[in-house]
Amino acid sequence: MKHFIKSIITLLIILTAFSLKAGDEFCGIKNTAFVPGELVTMKVYYNTMGLYIAAGEATFSTSAEKFNGKPSYHCIGVGKSYSFFDNFFKVRDRYETYIDTATMLPIKFIRDVNEGGHKIYNNVTFNHGTGTAVSTNGVYKISSCIQDVVSAIYYARNINFDKYKANDKIPFDMFLDDEVNHLYLRYIGKETVKTRYGKFHSIKIKPLLIKGTMFEGGEKMNVWISDDPNHLVLRIESPISVGNIKVDMMDYKNLKYPLTSLINTR
């Protein structure tokens, strides 16, 4: 379960922005999808022998704060392995971002992870005016309207999916591991999905993944999000280097809108 929360956040990045160029519609979107106080819990299941085992969970929370005098959304992703998996690989990860409420662009990104005793800390300050990101490891050029791995989730929840047709390929840029990554997602369409939480009307998409420790490159991941104004991630399925994983939304609090995509609970 190496890179646990990073992997979960990477899974959630499928919600990132839509534009023919990462600079047109990608910029300037206002937040209408979430409010401070929202809390969402995802549960991770791991499968190697045909049986899914609960391996851990990740929570995503938001609050309203000021950062360097700017009104900001403080969004935090926390991941941990369950005690059973701690015996194999203990994970205690924390990712957070401060998002400018006026532009929905990240101001500050912090990564503080402990994975199997291997600790990583990275602190990134974004300067969109000069097109640079100053991280713990150096200064890097960034593209306009770039997102970090947490801000992307909240930014993209404000996108109108109805304007896209099946198989549309939608590019976006993301700053991750001190690099600008040029990615895309493919819009598949709308369908009903059954999760461990319940049955939903959903939107299905496939992200392009970067080949890494856990995930194979390409479009092998499937993601379902709620077909309502909240655009919550409901389910993620993907093969990994050994076996496959499934991630389900299991709890939510303080959504801005009723979860009207929910047909029934289990």
Residue ranges and their predicted role:
Residues 18-22:
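Sec/Tat signal peptide C-region and signal peptidase I cleavage site
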Residues 118-160:
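Hydrophobic, well-structured mid-protein blocks that either form specific transmembrane helices
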Residues 8-17:
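Bacterial N-terminal signal peptides
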Residues 23-126, 164-266:
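Acidic, serine/threonine-rich low-complexity disordered tracts
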Residues 1-9:
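Bacterial N-terminal signal peptides that target proteins for export
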